[in-house]
Amino acid sequence: MAARHHAFILAGTGSGCGKTTLTLGLLRLLQKRALRVQPFKVGPDYLDTGWHTAICGVASRNLDSFMLPPPVLNALFCEQMRQADIAVIEGVMGLYDGYGVDPNYCSTAAMAKQLGCPVILLVDGKAVSTSLAATVMGFQHFDPTLNLAGVIVNRVASDAHYQLLKNAIEHYCSLPVLGYVPPCDGVALPERHLGLITARESLVNQQSWHDFAATLEQTVDVDALLSLSVLSALPTGMWPERPDNTAGAGLTLALADDEAFNFYYPDNIDLLERAGVNIVRFSPLHDRALPDCKMIWLGGGYPELYAAELAANTVMLKHLRAAHQRGVAIYAECGGLMYLGSTLEDSGGEIHQMANIIPGHSKMGKRLTRFGYCEAQAMQPTLLAVPGEIVRGHEFHYSDFIPETPAVMACRKVRDGRVLQEWTGGWQTGNTFASYLHVHFAQRPEMLQHWLATARRIL
């Protein structure tokens, strides 16, 4: 197995079709076969990767073609494959759903072509028979250049039902049906307004997933799946120039990591560590002091669910304000922005005092605000960019931030060649920068260089 590279993308007909649940079961099942698995997720989602990591113990990585140029994304993929026998890549939304109407832009299908990976299509078998072959045929012929290698059927009532579906699909589509997923209520993933509950919040019942993997072992032809997943070659990639391991030497970064703040791309943390930065984790919820540091990173998460506890930890808020006043280079994304604001109004209308470093008020709403990919151009110097530089990222939040100071980034959402929305966002005060944008540092090496340079000036 080690002599060959194996990978496949598990795609679906749409969101909510069971991709994440099956991905988790297959990760556990392949590990039972003593294979070194490397999970990936197409797109920017943090929640699915968190579940991947919790189930198999290996940090799952995001493959996002909006934020990352193809050579960089390919290099990221190849780097993780060095220590893996097989990559299990969970797709995003439906197979051909991307950013806009072009099925070859930011879609699962586009990622499969870029990486040269076969696609396994997950389809819903509930209350259907031969008509399911028509569904599969539509996906098969929509893009004949795509390597659609096999099918797995979800929500199958019985083996007899499965045989009916399998025979229809294989007869009319000439595609192998690799197995099915029976109803398994014990592994249903909990959800709330932002999608799945994080694996960190949910007590992962490892025995349930062990049992689910045992079920899949009986209903999915894993040997056939492995045979189909052999790659002829790994994609060609190239990292941009990265900060060398002396750029961050002597710098310590305090990383907020608890129930309220835990949305981070592992690649970003890797890049910081490779630059020589010492990373120390702390909890804004539970700790009474900050680590001794010259950099602080407050990532995304769910501060609105823990607003009372965050507000009650006045000692931590005081230490954060003192760090800001000393010039510590503080970077905050989404939930981190809400925490650094003056106040946070939760969904019940209760207002909580926050750090008051970025003057402004966060208020929870009932609908997503500016959801999706966007570009942000610096209008003045910021922690991550100088004027004119463009940062690509994504926003996913139900809150809105009402600032008391002008924003420093010009943001816009462009889809299918049209500007859909323009706004300003991102706030810089002293050496602190916060915005709703989630970013991947590998898109622009300058982002880390700016942050490290700011931190080094205060040594």
Residue positions per predicted region:
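A short helix->loop->beta-strand "cap" motif at the edges of active sites that frequently abuts
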Residues: 117, 175, 325-329
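A short, charged/proline- and glycine-enriched loop
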Residues: 3-6, 246-252
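Internal gly/pro-rich beta-alpha loop/helix module
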Residues: 129-245
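ATP-dependent carboxylate-amine ligase catalytic core
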Residues: 2-115, 119, 123-150, 159-163
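Phosphate-binding active sites in nucleotide-utilizing proteins
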Residues: 249-325
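Beta-strand->loop->alpha-helix junctions that form or flank phosphate-binding loops
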Residues: 41-42, 177-185, 278-285
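Cysteine-nucleophile active-site neighborhood
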Residues: 303-383
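C-terminal and late-domain segments of enzyme folds
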Residues: 112, 246-249, 261-271, 278, ...
